[in-house]
């Protein structure tokens, strides 16, 4: 099958591999992007696909805490200029409060709820669109709860480009919970702990690592031991509690919180626009440059 430039671009963004390597991988896998990622990894050309592989939209993430409840919200705009607008920032905060007030479970349900002034959230967003002059949309939100013996950690990076909400059980040290939220913003783990990783994901990773070791020419009798070591490293990379704490790399996140009497039980990390299609700018010029 013909491999499109768009597909090559997507694989490059996922893996960081070179254009020709990506094209070959897609050709070998009949254009299946997930199989192409594995192909590149097995050849030692690429690391695991990034979690936030395609980021394009602008906007803000906001975290609103109230007692034993907290909400994290992402609202998108078209430009970064609008994301810095005070009116837009106020809208995002207002929507986060509305999430806590209404207990809405979906964006659609939230849009139909009424604000204290009697207007629906949908009306409020449309008014903001008219005033600001850009398309705005509520993309997603999440609510977390805790007890009086626990703590929330809220951290916003780059003024709300990345937002994290953590739930730490057994400790009321909100500063420690915030430090862990900062760690999660920086390192971007997928899970709290290895207990959350599915058996299917572990089996898939084990297969990829085994093929990778065999392709490196390692003797069959030591491959299994190598695979288990690399699998432990992989799990450390994707599980928050096993990672070296950014503020003190000599201890893990789990050890840091344990010293405060707490345990990380949940987190939500939003990065503005993650997973959304990028605008296709300058890729044709890049292709032309490669062909010279």
From Swiss-Prot:
Predominant subcellular localization, coarse grouping: cytoplasm
CDD domains xrefs: UBA_EF-Ts (cd14275)
NCBIfam families: tsf (TIGR00116)
Protein name from the UniProt record: Elongation factor Ts
Pfam family, one: EF_TS
Role summary: Associates with the EF-Tu.GDP complex and induces the exchange of GDP to GTP. It remains bound to the aminoacyl-tRNA.EF-Tu.GTP complex up to the GTP hydrolysis stage on the ribosome.
Cellular compartment(s): Cytoplasm
Family, similarity comment: Belongs to the EF-Ts family.
Positions of the UniProt region annotated as Involved in Mg(2+) ion dislocation from EF-Tu: 79-82
GO molecular function: translation elongation factor activity
One GO cellular component term: cytoplasm
InterPro entries the record matches: EF-Ts_dimer_sf, Transl_elong_EFTs/EF1B, Transl_elong_EFTs/EF1B_dimer, Transl_elong_Ts_CS, UBA-like_sf
Keywords attached to this entry: Cytoplasm, Elongation factor, Protein biosynthesis
